[in-house]
């Protein structure tokens, strides 16, 4: 367990960061990504608020980016022309380099909640301003389908609706705000990597489509996000695009394949003194919310996943925090929501960074997909790949372990549209009288060089980046999953 002294240091770090942010807004923007999360004092210190993070967005329009790209759970920052900068050695011209490959991994955009309050919802969710298309077509011959879409409705005669939620949405599903955020996300990527850096091809079918690789989970959330983002990247393209997916039962993202050891390791992680301490210091909050929303079950009380998800989805789509259906004067307060969000951040940092089993847990959950990323990087290094741009649409449960594998300094819950950009450059020292070029890498998290236990990954040999990730790729995942 972290000592009282460590907790005191975390408190001092928190106060110092808040004071620093008042005098240096540019520095404060990046500080919002790296709170002192290693002690539970971060959760209980109400003066921290959201640690500069944003938890609100308009209902039916795209989110507005902040000037300095602060942590925004509803629509995480991403590379865009206004804030993008070249790697320092390239910017100061000590190295002559060109970008040759981009591996881009992102979470889907904002959505409705997975978790509906057990006592029912006092506000309806509306999604009739979005069409969730549901159709197939023959690959080469055959009649063209009618492009049907799903239109959710609430039937007042359905008795189960009383303790559920009225409206025209599925739970979860992408919202119009999420779709528009995705479109802007793609426009910004195109402006940086297609127009400014001339890496992404002007059309996805260039060189018979061999320059790009598009991947997603089997979820409608990631597929719908891909449609919006890729329209932003290629606004003039008017043909279908393949979005590659593995079979859901063996998918290497979104915990697709069965692995009994995963739950065993997670159980061990959530049985530690540190984990129990965070439950102890939040007991009063959890009891209050459980009583208010009839949520006194293990799935709602054993961690903050469900309450965070419910509150985030409301605030990120223009709704209010929930009130009890039995007594609408009893509502979740802003202060309670902020503590829920801080606890959620603490949990994510603990799952993927701060517990003794983090390496094995990452191997079990995300090791195979990390292996896919590394194989892409190695193929570029070896000159055997035609790819210049790979884009994967995944989930927070994929982004978190990848950030953990990179050794991120502190891990807040990866918000909607959170993204990791692995940039690979070929370059040589300007001062050297040689034509030899080496491969270098930079890793951006939400548009800026990631801060890690290895330092800021803004310009390192590609081989060093591969070495950082390699320990998280299991040699034999089947045996590892069967081990106890």
Regions found by a protein language model. Name each.
Residues 1-30:
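Fungal secretory targeting signals
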Residues 27-213, 217-390, 394-484:
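Signature for phosphate-centric chemistry
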């Amino acid at each position: 367990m972290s000592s009282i002294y460590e907790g005191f240091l975390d408190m001092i770090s928190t106060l110092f960061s808040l004071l620093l942010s008042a005098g240096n807004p540019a520095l404060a923007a990046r500080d919002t990504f790296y709170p002192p999360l290693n002690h539970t004092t971060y959760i209980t210190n109400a003066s921290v608020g959201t640690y500069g993070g944003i938890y609100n967005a308009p209902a039916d329009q795209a989110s507005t980016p902040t000037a300095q790209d602060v942590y925004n759970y509803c629509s995480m920052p991403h590379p865009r022309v206004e804030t993008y900068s070249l790697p320092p050695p390239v910017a100061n011209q000590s190295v002559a380099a060109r970008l040759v490959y981009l591996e881009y991994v992102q979470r889907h955009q904002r959505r409705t909640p997975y978790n509906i309050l057990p006592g029912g919802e006092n506000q309806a969710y509306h999604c009739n301003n979005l069409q969730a298309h549901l159709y197939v077509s023959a690959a080469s011959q055959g009649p063209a389908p009618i492009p049907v879409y799903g239109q959710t409705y609430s039937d007042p005669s359905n008795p189960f609706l009383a303790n559920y939620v009225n409206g025209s949405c599925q739970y979860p599903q992408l919202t119009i705000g999420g779709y528009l955020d995705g479109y802007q996300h793609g426009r910004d990527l195109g402006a940086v990597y297609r127009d400014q850096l001339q890496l992404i091809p002007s059309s996805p079918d260039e060189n018979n489509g061999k320059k790009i690789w598009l991947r997603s989970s089997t979820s409608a959330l990631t597929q719908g996000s891909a449609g919006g983002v890729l329209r932003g990247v290629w606004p003039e393209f008017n043909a279908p695009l393949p979005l590659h997916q593995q079979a859901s039962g063996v998918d290497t993202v979104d915990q697709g394949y069965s692995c009994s050891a995963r739950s065993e390791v997670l159980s061990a992680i959530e049985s530690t003194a540190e984990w129990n301490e965070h439950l102890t210091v939040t007991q009063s909050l959890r009891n209050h919310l459980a009583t208010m929303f009839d949520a006194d079950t293990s799935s709602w009380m054993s961690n903050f996943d469900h309450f965070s998800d419910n509150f985030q989805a409301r605030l990120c789509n223009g709704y209010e925090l929930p009130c009890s259906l039995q007594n609408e004067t009893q509502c979740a307060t802003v202060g309670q929501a902020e503590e829920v969000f801080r606890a959620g951040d603490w949990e994510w940092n603990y799952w993927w960074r701060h517990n003794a089993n983090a390496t094995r847990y990452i191997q079990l959950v995300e090791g195979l997909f990390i292996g896919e990323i590394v194989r892409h990087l190695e193929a570029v290094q070896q000159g055997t790949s035609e790819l210049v741009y790979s884009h994967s649409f995944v989930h927070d449960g994929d982004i978190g372990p990848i950030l953990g594998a990179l050794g991120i300094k502190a891990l807040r819950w990866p918000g909607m549209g959170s993204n990791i950009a692995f940039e690979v450059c070929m370059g040589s020292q300007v001062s050297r009288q040689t034509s030899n070029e080496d491969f270098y890498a930079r890793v951006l998290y939400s548009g800026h060089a990631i801060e890690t236990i290895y330092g800021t990954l803004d310009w390192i040999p590609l081989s060093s980046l591969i070495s950082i990730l390699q320990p998280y790729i299991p040699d034999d995942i089947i045996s590892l999953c069967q081990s106890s």
